Amino acid sequence: MAEEIERVGRLVVFSAPSGTGKSTIARRVLERFPSMRFSVSATTRPMREGEVDGVNYHFLSKEDFESEIRNGGFIEHEFFFGNHYGTLLQKTREAMAQGTDLLLDLDVKGAMNLKKLFPDSSLLVFLAPPSMDVLKERLQSRKSEDEESLKLRLERARLELGFADRFDTVIINDTLEDAVEAVILAISNFLSTKQTT
């Protein structure tokens, strides 16, 4: 009798401009796929009250983070508002080896890096706004953006949209429920396909 091959976890990556509903859709996906886990990022920022290492973030010293960078320990990393953030390659591999499917929130550069590392085990989903005008309205309705911040987010969105055709699927979030259903269908199809090793 042939030995049964254990299932290897899969990676679902969301990339999207700010204001496209990514966080809301991610919550709905995790509700629909209860065995899927949200990837925990590493950071050098100080732990806040109530946060737990390994749950909210993997909290690393600046020295340890920079050592991981030098040793190729990140799928992606960035320096943002004075702190490093990144996705640890080893933690991702460990989850996959345990058969755990992960949902990752990465920028387009990080998504491209992940696809190079895990071409057959990853689904890249780009969530797009119906138009730049709608995106601008959504960002303004948050009332959390000053004029300069809004301008920067819209410029970044234009750049990110230029990468959309390199993703496995592009979902336009015009109506939230339709977008959620489209994302769930894409993930269901991906998870049901046979993996190549």
From Swiss-Prot:
One Pfam family this sequence matches: Guanylate_kin
A GO molecular function held by the record: ATP binding
Keyword Transmembrane in annotation: no
Location of this chain's protein in the cell: Cytoplasm
Keyword list, A-Z: ATP-binding, Cytoplasm, Kinase, Nucleotide-binding, Transferase
Residue numbers binding ATP: A16, P17, S18, G19, T20, G21, K22, S23
Top enzyme class: transferase
Residue intervals of the Guanylate kinase-like domain: 9-188
Catalyses which reaction(s): GMP + ATP = GDP + ADP
EC numbers, comma separated: 2.7.4.8
Function in brief: Essential for recycling GMP and indirectly, cGMP.
Recorded family membership: Belongs to the guanylate kinase family.
Name of protein: Guanylate kinase
Species this protein is from: Chlorobium luteolum (strain DSM 273 / BCRC 81028 / 2530)
